[in-house]
Swiss-Prot record:
It comes from the Eukaryota. Residues 24-61, 131-157, 173-194, 270-432 are annotated as: Disordered. It comes from Homo sapiens (Human). The modification Pyrrolidone carboxylic acid is found at Q24. Transglutaminase substrate. This is Semenogelin-1. Residues 1-23 form the signal peptide. It is found in: Secreted.
Amino acid sequence: MKPNIIFVLSLLLILEKQAAVMGQKGGSKGRLPSEFSQFPHGQKGQHYSGQKGKQQTESKGSFSIQYTYHVDANDHDQSRKSQQYDLNALHKTTKSQRHLGGSQQLLHNKQEGRDHDKSKGHFHRVVIHHKGGKAHRGTQNPSQDQGNSPSGKGISSQYSNTEERLWVHGLSKEQTSVSGAQKGRKQGGSQSSYVLQTEELVANKQQRETKNSHQNKGHYQNVVEVREEHSSKVQTSLCPAHQDKLQHGSKDIFSTQDELLVYNKNQHQTKNLNQDQQHGRKANKISYQSSSTEERRLHYGENGVQKDVSQSSIYSQTEEKAQGKSQKQITIPSQEQEHSQKANKISYQSSSTEERRLHYGENGVQKDVSQRSIYSQTEKLVAGKSQIQAPNPKQEPWHGENAKGESGQSTNREQDLLSHEQKGRHQHGSHGGLDIVIIEQEDDSDRHLAQHLNNDRNPLFT
């Protein structure tokens, strides 16, 4: 509540100074702070000299605004003193604006710029935490930052200088481009006691902002957070590597966290999730290599996967690992069955069914115990932490001629489920959650389920 009151008082003081400029435009350049002691009475001069020492000591601690006038019942002297006081503060204000490299138009149009930003839907929150005591490392007297050498300056003028610096930083950073705002910060407030943090992070600037924010949290106590919520600027806050890994889900909205550490943690979690998804997709991709028809259908459904392969070197390594595992999955069942054509169809269907269950039913209950250790190795490569044992291909419900008749329906349904799961994981990957789908085998409802998934696939491509 106290910072809000101080902020309102500072705005009123600035408006009063602007009114004084409009009335007396040419008298501010010739006045010096030493003219305050030239009062007609000795009592007033002694009081002001004592007030100067008090103001010097309080400039290092908390800010305060004091208007103390021990003047006799002479209205002319009192009005003269107040005018000199305001003109001196205005003189220091113009010097501070020249030192910052900004034009005086920023100060005059400050209220107009705030209204313009509010009309665009930008929300600003300014939190000022200031504690008493000596200034920390990097904290200086605000009047000394502006290049003012004479001592004995009023606390109200120091506070107005600080507020003007704060608003010049905040508004120029929001109204002008990023390069202009960075130039203004380097000239004026690189060592000031205020740290401005905004969430309009550009991709080539994010590492520097992160480093500066961690240093400022350790060195400063006066923190001013100016946050701007805008959907287009939030989407540009992604790293280039993060955009490459999540380009397939570019329609997702990534909510920027309050803490940069939490944001980096979510990046690593999403990265690991996408690596697991790529393991599963590559393992399922190459397990269907024994049929040219399945390769054609799979190539239709994995155009997005090929983009991810061209953008990252991790995907090519995953493809090599998954290729070795999937070839073993196809050749080992075909060697154990001792029947040439019919056995190859059964082994292909069983391996594809196991791949589907390993990819979807990671936490499903499967009571069948596999006699091949290569399936558990592939399942560890896909999921990383799951402990599911794949079912035995000999116990699968495809035998004899039924396997020949149902192979086309099962592969079509598996392909539909594969594309459905890939799109679902791309959409929900930013939230850090895994979609777990347990699918039971029913011979009567195979065609109905495949048709239903084909109907559900269409909204995912939009």
